[in-house]
């Protein structure tokens, strides 16, 4: 194989798979079926999938799009740690978590989490818990772009306070998945 730089292999450094756990960060559209297939097992009686999409408003303000950014090495470590914990705690056969980065237009997918388990109850619980852990801990931030040009960076979780800014980058020291001060 010829030597290629990392820019020619963008997904190589943006995904990790081990012990029935798969995580990824990508600028491409998410492939829900591919994510489900990563957790499929003949020992599983249930696969639960969560797909988060960009909605068209936040707090009554029309949203144009979301723009996600991440500290990839740390985000991947946190994501795989969450997946391993969920797999052990809930007795899962597999778990996959893929987050989109960059611009995500209205109605497009920003995150896919798939879990497989012998029984549906564990799959439901694990899927929801994995999402909440991801939103609370993973080093991914989003900028909500509103109609009219205003934008707000906020931690990647519901109800997190935002900070109106004029630049296209999050504040330095914004924290590891934590809130950005008003």
UniProtKB/Swiss-Prot annotation:
It is found in: Cytoplasm. The gene is cnxH. Heterotetramer; composed of 2 small (MOCS2A) and 2 large (MOCS2B) subunits. It catalyses: 2 [molybdopterin-synthase sulfur-carrier protein]-C-terminal-Gly-aminoethanethioate + cyclic pyranopterin phosphate + H2O = molybdopterin + 2 [molybdopterin-synthase sulfur-carrier protein]-C-terminal Gly-Gly + 2 H(+). Residues 152-182 are annotated as: Disordered. Belongs to the MoaE family. MOCS2B subfamily. GO terms for molecular function: molybdopterin synthase activity. The keyword Transmembrane does not apply. Its EC number is 2.8.1.12. Its main location: cytoplasm. GO terms for biological process: Mo-molybdopterin cofactor biosynthetic process. Keywords: Cytoplasm, Molybdenum cofactor biosynthesis, Transferase. Substrate binds at residues 119-120, 135, 142-144. Signal peptide: none annotated. InterPro entries: MoaE_sf (IPR036563), MOCS2B_euk (IPR028888), Mopterin_biosynth_MoaE (IPR003448). Catalytic subunit of the molybdopterin synthase complex, a complex that catalyzes the conversion of precursor Z into molybdopterin. Acts by mediating the incorporation of 2 sulfur atoms from thiocarboxylated MOCS2A into precursor Z to generate a dithiolene group. This is Molybdopterin synthase catalytic subunit. Gene3D superfamilies: Molybdopterin biosynthesis MoaE subunit (3.90.1170.40).
